[in-house]
Amino acid sequence: MNFKFARFKSIFNILFILIIAFPGGLIYLLTGSTLSFWLRESDFDKITIGLFGLVNFIHIFKFLWGPLLEKISFSTLSNRGYKYCLVITLINCIFCVYVLTSFNPNTNFIPFVLCLVVLAFFSSIYDMLIQSSQMLLITDKNWGISEAACTTGFRIGILISGSGALYLSTIISWQDVYRTMAILCIPSLLLIIFYPLKFKDKIIDNDFDRFLNAFYDFIKKPKCIVIISFMLLYRLQDSFLSIMPNMFYLDIGYTKQDLAVGYKAFGMCATIFGGVIGGFLCRKYEYSYLLKRVLIYHALSSLSFIYLYFLNQDITSLYIAVFCQEFTKGLTMSPFFSYQLKCCSSRYCITQIALITSITNVGTILIGSISGYAATYLGWSYFFIVAGLCFIPAYILILYLPKTINSV
């Protein structure tokens, strides 16, 4: 009887993670890819649009407030403290999205950018809380599945704020589109408020020494420098591409309606499918083997951009190219994020997850911010060739990753 109860509890926790990941994905695109379409229609050039990626630079520093979150979340309030953090953070995200709609990027440039930065700040906190919830609620043998669920929820959010927002923008203004996205976050907020959280382990009260202990615990792991370098470079290809595929598809003649269905909606389904397959593969294959294989598959997907550019630009070709790109992207995510969790200790989960994702975001944000320059001066063909070669540094580092990691 206890076994059946534990099994149902695990399933409900995984579903909870899926649903609370939805606003994270939805908000993610509102400061990224979807924003680029709004800026493009406001007559900003590729270089400026690429530089807008720097509003997410604050994600790099989220490891600094990770210990503070642990202090608040894992105090004597325990489960309630963690829930309060989730609720307050999501409310602030919704509020910032709504305030953003009060500004025009052309006439209110500085307030517009500042509001985006504040939104990115609260979004980074929410992402930390989502990721750490997997470690706190899910047993380690189910991390691959929980990450697939988290990726699925995140990607559904991206689907709504990507395909849905793009389609809505053909009917209503971008300001109204963003207001609609803010409203769609409310059901997840209500679930967080009413869902009974219960951690799998007893959480130890925090003190300031844990700030340093969390970093020391991570640094003393075998081959720490290799792990950090790997985290920094694994998603180099996606970082280099950044939001430029949006501009590419528009430049070669596809309409927003084509992209809403063929790129955003279909592409998101392909990414989710890839994420689910990747999650189950995590249970079957050893990490280094799987990470190498999916990295190569994703690198080869860059050929689909070149195919579209030189050979064929019809709707069928768009679907084929998008499937190659997005399925392999999803395939890389589950093993990568599961490996991130494996590198963390449960007693310092928020701080260490924040540290790891901050390292990952350094490459994503800094490299992504120059993608506009690269696309402008290299041209589309050479731009995608360089993107395809970006897998090489991470592939080499995988060969030197430690075989075992202490994540207690």
UniProtKB/Swiss-Prot annotation:
Membrane-spanning parts: 11-31, 49-69, 84-104, 110-130, 154-174, 177-197, 224-244, 261-281, 294-311, 353-373, 382-402
Domain of life: Bacteria
Any Pfam family: MFS_1
Record's keyword terms, sorted: Cell inner membrane, Cell membrane, Membrane, Transmembrane, Transmembrane helix, Transport
CDD domains tied to this protein: MFS_AmpG_like
Primary localisation category: membrane
Similarity remark: Belongs to the major facilitator superfamily.
Protein name from the UniProt record: Putative transporter AmpG 2
Gene: ampG2
